[in-house]
Amino acid sequence: MTIAIDYFLLVGFCFAFTSGLYLGLKSIKLI
């Protein structure tokens, strides 16, 4: 059970990191 929770947190962290990086690059291109 804890392994599934850790996996879910890892996927959520990766998704947040990639989305933040994408938005950051997008904002840099807009400037």
UniProtKB/Swiss-Prot annotation:
Membrane topology, record value: Single-pass membrane protein
Residues passing through the membrane, by range: 3-23
Keyword entries, A-Z: Chloroplast, Electron transport, Membrane, Photosynthesis, Plastid, Thylakoid, Transmembrane, Transmembrane helix, Transport
Family matches, as InterPro entries: Cyt_b6/f_cplx_su6 (IPR007802)
Localization: Plastid, Chloroplast thylakoid membrane
Main subcellular localisation: plastid
Domain of life of the native organism: Eukaryota
GO term, biological process aspect, one: photosynthesis
A Pfam family: PetL
One term under GO cellular component: chloroplast thylakoid membrane
UniProt GO molecular function: electron transporter, transferring electrons within cytochrome b6/f complex of photosystem II activity
Family statement drawn from the similarity comment of this UniProt entry: Belongs to the PetL family.
Quaternary organization: The 4 large subunits of the cytochrome b6-f complex are cytochrome b6, subunit IV (17 kDa polypeptide, PetD), cytochrome f and the Rieske protein, while the 4 small subunits are PetG, PetL, PetM and PetN. The complex functions as a dimer.
Stated role: Component of the cytochrome b6-f complex, which mediates electron transfer between photosystem II (PSII) and photosystem I (PSI), cyclic electron flow around PSI, and state transitions. PetL is important for photoautotrophic growth as well as for electron transfer efficiency and stability of the cytochrome b6-f complex.
Name of protein: Cytochrome b6-f complex subunit 6
Taxonomic source organism: Trieres chinensis (Marine centric diatom)
Lineage of origin: Eukaryota, Sar, Stramenopiles, Ochrophyta, Bacillariophyta
